[in-house]
Amino acid sequence: MRYQVTSVLCIGLILCFSIQPVEIYWCDVDIRFTESICGVSVVAFLMLMWRRQRIFLSAIDIIVALWFAYVMLRAYIDSTYPCANYILRVMQMMSLYVSLRLLFSSFQVSEKIVIFAILICAIYEVFLGADQMINGYSRHYLFTITGSFLNPGPYSVFLSMGLVMTCQMKKELYLGKGVVPSLVSYLPLAFLILLPATWSRAALLSAAISLGIIYRNQWKRWRWWGFAGIVIIVTVLYFLKQGSADGRSIIYLISLLCISHTPIFGSGIGSFCHQYAEGMANFSSNYPTFNFASADVTFNAYNCLLQIGVEQGLIGICLFVVLVSMTLIKLRKNTKILGTALLCLLIFSMFSYPFEQLPYQIICVLIVAYAANDVADSIFSTKWHIFCRCYIAPAVLCSAVVLFSIFIHKQIRERVRAESDYRMMAGVSHTAFIDDYYELLPLMASNEHFLFNFAKILAADGRYNDSNAMLRLGSLTSCDPMFYVIQGNNYGEMGFYKEAEAAYKKAFNVMPNRLYPLYQLMLLYEKEGNTKEMVDMAKRVISFDEKVVSPATKGLKKKAIIIINRNKQKNRK
């Protein structure tokens, strides 16, 4: 009994971090999470020693190890892009996986414990979201419901997962009679009521597909009506948020083009934003009549397969597909409830970015580690020496987790401190902070806001080459065209007009629905004294159909009109 309680406490401790407030950058939660992983691995190792249990190697373990080794090797061989944060997270998740494998090997944890632990987290998010709607507060001023997240998109995954898990549970398990079973039987309604409030099409679609699979036998005779209903619903959802859907279609198209350029090994870990900007620039210059109205700055592919394909190539995609397939097959045999939850999460990841959020990384690793814990599918289990399986292998794995945790803990603490220092001086753009920015640079090289602000401060101090160096570094981590616009400004200040012109044109090609790069080109031609190009660009600015009409864009067009009128007056004279 005590081992079961210990296992439940360890699982609960890990899952507690899936309901903590999610932040964009490193925070204290990540520090505590790393400490918890280390603690769980030590506890699991002691339980293994005390109970004299043996660990075994499964096929899932091999795929996980191969994928981890490939990512680490890929990042080591090609260090072009700042990817330290990504690698730290990968190491953290690998440490979590090994810790959970040790835990599940030390004691046979019931599937119900894992299921109810995840459901408790989902129910907590339901109460949190309902409280936000009732009391009118959330973590984003534009949305009424966000849960522990910064927007309702990722939050909706908890609701869709909770919905499909409870529906699968009602179908498979006999809950009995009484107050508690009755309450459990109505749990799907709690998730179903809040899910539409998130306005997440990906969550609705993933829930609908998962529920269709769960109840496939019941609706076989109505399948054509069901397909027709799905088509109608998808069409309605598309037109409700057409701009967003069109924008993601552009992201998918450019991502596929990026994969085609480096199909086998990908462009490198952490390369997506830069490759997306380069791909967009090439595509827009070759197809200028394409409708780019819905294009926008993005930091991910909104599709985990495409994200992996761009950075890791077909090798990464194959490892991901094999791992997912093996896990789903294993869960289908042993525990369909967890398999349904993972399937819902995977479907959602085809349209969004749940695997970039710590809560879903934790849940995914937990489910995969549980699926790998099947003695029937163990590899080399009879050939390993008993002493090795009982003592040496657990000791090596636990030591590796502890060493990884110490390294990760130190790195995250330094980055949390650097983020705190940057926030204190981010609102003050003064050249007195240049030395402080240089001191933080090694830890903040993947923070595009830090690099952009640093570049502006250097430019204000007249250090244009240093500013451009920071902007080039920023363009490796962001596809924001402003990194190229500021480079053009710096080149213009130094009198390098050809380089400035190239930078402005690159900025426009990266985001062809932005007016500002064309406006800067117009001013550059005016500064050069190139009247013909200036007038042509002014006319282009005036006729430009911008994505969002605002006082700023009206001001830019007004300036272009003034330039044209001034040129006409000069010609009359």
Stretches found by the model and what they are:
Residues R139, I269-E311:
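Interfacial juxtamembrane loops and adjacent helix segments
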Residues P442, R472-L476, K506-N509, S543:
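Conserved structural position within tetratricopeptide repeats
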Residues F450, F483-Y484, P517, P551:
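TPR alpha-solenoid repeat register
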Residues Y437-Y438, L471, Y504, A538:
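Hydrophobic/aromatic packing residues within the alpha-helices of TPR/SEL1-like helical repeat arrays
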Residues V8-I11, L15-P21, I37-M47, F68-A75, ...:
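Alpha-helical transmembrane segments of multi-pass inner-membrane proteins
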Residues T144-I145, A203, S210, G226-P263, ...:
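Flexible juxtamembrane loops connecting transmembrane helices in multi-pass membrane enzymes
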